[in-house]
Amino acid sequence: MVKYDAVILGSGVLGLSIANELTLKGLKVAVVGNDLPEDLDSTGFASPWAGANWHSFAINEAERRRDQYTFEQFARLAKEIPHLCERRAYYYLWKGEGAWKEPWYKDVVFGYRMLKPEEVHAPFKYGVTYEAYTLNTPLYLLHLASTLRSARVPILRARLSSLDEAYSLPQLGSVDLVINATGLGARSLLGVEDPTVYPAKGQTVLVRAPVKECYGLVDPLAQPGQKAYIIPRPGPDGYVILGGCYFPNDWSTNVNPEVAEEILKQCHTLCPRLDGKGGKGTWKDIEVISHNVGLRPVREAGLRCEVEERVIGEKVNAGLATKGGKVGGGRKVGVVHAYGIGPAGYQASLGIAKEVGELVDGWMKKSNKKAKL
């Protein structure tokens, strides 16, 4: 049996990005998830439902570092595989003076500037523009998975009830290191059970429209979770994601028709060309492809990205572990937690993967482990 250095729990964008990072470092890894990258219609994980665009809302240096690193990697991806990642113009519009606060990333993105009055259409009075990146998220997930499989990294479907099981899965054998990228699963996974993890429901509308630019509504008076945005997807299909909403602690995956209608109305106001009639139609003329719901994996304190040393085995957890988790009398192991990123999963993914890679390096050095090349 192949000997693995680590098992990654979670096959969303974080789990797959981390697996790629560790593979590039020469580690033998495997990915295990309830849902696989091909399950693009599953509401069991958030990754397939994202827009996604790079629009950082980092509030501290660690978050800024992750987002900026990912931005730089997206630049490379956009040149190499443009149908996955594309650089395009962004426009953020608002009505009242002072609504926009100058962002930290104004010198990271391309061509940041305030719009002239004649460049802003009614009912808006102010705006800002710059260029950044958007992803075709379903294709990007499949790309990450394909890259891993080409490197002979297994991506397996398994439903684990406890963290301890991951250290001795029948298909993979015994490992001493697990990466916990379980997203919302971190709330219920035995051995983690983080009560501060919760969902933030997002609802979007996938449409087909002749729009190539991203748009966002800046409205300090908007209802919580109700801020319109428009994200064209790279590729030849002409697909555009319209959003959005952000409803904390809402576990429902049902589409709310009233929310969908409000999204279409607000987005048509942001960019009338969505109607396919040069802006001369109404929101009802927008060509709707599908209505979508995803549950963002949020954590009250933000991302948890840290190493935890654990002891597993019959002497420690005989009352909790499943049979697969009982692997001897008190074996010392490690786990790197990487969950709770909320709505910033894609725009921080590669920066988080880099950080996890550094934590793994430190853990292996401390534990006198060598990669199983």
From Swiss-Prot:
MF (Gene Ontology): D-amino-acid oxidase activity; FAD binding
Protein name: D-amino-acid oxidase 3
UniProt organism field: Cryptococcus neoformans var. grubii serotype A (strain H99 / ATCC 208821 / CBS 10515 / FGSC 9487)
UniProt keyword terms in alphabetical order: Disulfide bond, FAD, Flavoprotein, Glycoprotein, Oxidoreductase, Peroxisome, Signal
One GO CC annotation: peroxisomal matrix
Compartments it resides in: Peroxisome matrix
SUPFAM superfamilies in the cross-refs: FAD-linked reductases, C-terminal domain, Nucleotide-binding domain
Cofactor: FAD
InterPro entries listed in its UniProt record: DAO, FAD-dep_OxRdtase
Binding site for anthranilate 1: Y229, R296
Enzyme Commission code: 1.4.3.3
Family the UniProt entry places it in: Belongs to the DAMOX/DASOX family.
Positions with a binding annotation for anthranilate 2: F57, Y246
Lineage: Eukaryota, Fungi, Dikarya, Basidiomycota, Agaricomycotina
Disulphide connectivity of cysteines: C214-C271
Record: residues binding (R)-lactate: Y229, Y246, R296
